Amino acid sequence: ALILSKEKVTNNKTNLDDAMLGGYIIYKEKGKLKGVILSSGMEVETAIKVAESLDGIRVVSITCFELFDEQPKAYRNKILTDKPKIVMELSSSYSYYKYASNGLYFTTDKFGKSGSSTELREFYGFTPEKIIKKVKKFLKIE
């Protein structure tokens, strides 16, 4: 499937071989790992902004749940680790529960609100500033 957006999106220099694994580290944490953000598509840009603002946060881009689940358990464990998970996805949270059952979720399970992209991100709390504040509290980061 080809999925397009009306929004301007940053090219994160994705490697096709990595994408074909279904999930991979797109941003490596600075310092000791404290948490892992799971995201996909255009939300990865916001996830990286959050991770750049906090030490110890890794961003994993999930390109395909089915392909990721087919990878060896050792690979999946290396990518996800046992650290707390944060899910950032402007769609349903449903697909992420098996990876982040006790995680912090920034998702949209309600639809029908109209507005510009900026207005909707603000309404749903999907701005780097709001997310950073909640992630700090969730991970008990000063």
Give the predicted meaning of each segment.
Residues 1-142:
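Thiamine diphosphate
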